Design a protein with these regions (language model features):
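Alpha/beta-hydrolase fold nucleophile elbow
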Residues: 136-148, 172
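The conserved beta1-alpha1 loop
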Residues: 69-71, 147, 176
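Active-site nucleophile loop of the alpha/beta-hydrolase fold
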Residues: 170-181, 204-207, 226
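Flexible, membrane-associating and regulatory peripheral segments of lipid-active enzymes
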Residues: 1-99, 105-117, 126-139, 164-167, ...
Length: 336
């Protein structure tokens, strides 16, 4: 096992080179527009042919548009993408859902290849999104969502639109943005920040592990404290990038997808720390919803608790932290 762990981390950082079927070129980034009611109905096109979207049946340019950016070593068939896309197609069918498939540049070495490619992918995508906006796509209805490395792709995309094309995105959602190589800021790459869009909301579920260790948005949400191990995830999962090892990191997109279907599933309470949240006698004061329907005026850190399995949302119960009072319990037992 320990040899597997060692080999796993070496592959994570240094990789095995670009995979044979991966070109590592921005010219081979694809857009996948889901034009049906399931994840199996879609149209793929090269990024530089984004203008074709306007001619595809099912694409309504005046409707809300979500651009989703996946994470490290993911492909278009990954569970995270299927879960996120299905939530929108089934619950919000009036939304244009588009995957930025940069899997050709998200493989190989994390440090040498994938992390450094986030800026290239963001810039290349921004150029095409800029053209779509000039052709009539409403900027105020554009929502960028990214998971892990995809969060930083979304940040670079929004930053490029703002700085180069003078177009400010209304909202970027970062789902447990990747930690290694991005924090502290500039250690290798620059990370997503609150100034990248009018509103940047962040969901932390593996802070200090695979995910960002600090606040990085306009509003940062810390379910169950925001760290590993999230409820329902294995406590011992030493093999890097295994499903068990990624469980807490993946909770971010599972929570968000659930919020698309149930916008009031995850009330969150403002607090300076998880400890203060647990001690707060009035957590409903300043409460906002984490996820799809988050109030864009929210600022600061917010906390909540979740269930260990779907449905993860507890509703209002999630902001009332229940303490185990062993003394009280023992006292009652002694009185019997």
């Amino acid at each position: 096992m320990f040899r597997a762990v060692s080999v796993g981390w070496k592959k994570y950082w240094w990789g095995t080179g670009v995979l044979p079927d991966r070109t590592n070129r921005v010219e081979d980034i694809y857009l996948r527009f889901y034009n049906g009611s399931t994840c199996e109905e879609y149209v793929d096109m090269p990024l530089d042919q984004a203008h074709r979207l306007f001619d595809i049946k099912g694409f309504e340019k005046n409707n809300p548009t979500v651009l989703y950016m996946h994470g490290f070593i993911e492909t278009a068939q990954q569970e995270s993408i299927q879960v996120m896309v299905s939530a929108y197609l089934e619950s919000r069918p009036d939304t244009n859902v588009i995957l930025i498939d940069w899997s050709n540049m998200a493989h190989g070495s994390y440090l040498v290849n994938a992390a450094r490619n986030t800026k290239k992918v963001g810039a290349a995508t921004a150029e095409q999104v800029h053209k779509l906006i000039d052709a009539g796509l409403p900027l105020d209805k554009l929502h960028l969502i990214g998971h892990s490395l995809g969060s930083h792709v979304a940040g670079y995309l929004a930053r490029e639109l703002k700085n180069k094309y003078r177009k400010t995105v209304k909202r970027v959602t970062a789902l447990d943005p990747a930690f290694p190589a991005f924090y502290p800021d500039g250690v290798v790459m620059e990370h997503i920040v609150d100034k990248d869009a009018e509103f940047v909301d962040v969901i932390h579920t593996d802070a200090g592990g695979y995910g960002a260790p600090v606040r990085t948005g306009s509003a940062d949400f810390w379910p169950n404290g925001g760290k590993s191990v999230q409820p329902g995830c294995p406590r011992f999962a030493p093999v890097p990038l295994s499903d068990d090892n990624l469980c807490s990191h993946w909770r971010s997109w599972r929570f968000y997808a659930e919020s698309v279907r149930n916008p009031e599933a995850f009330p969150a309470s403002p607090a300076d720390s998880y400890h203060k949240f647990r001690e707060n006698p009035s957590p409903e004061v300043g409460m906002v919803y984490m996820g799809a329907n988050c109030d864009p005026s929210a600022r600061g850190s917010y906390y909540l608790t979740t269930n260990a399995a779907p449905p993860f949302g507890k509703g209002m119960e999630g902001i009332y932290y229940k303490k185990k009072n062993k003394k009280a319990t023992n006292g009652k037992n002694n009185m019997k």
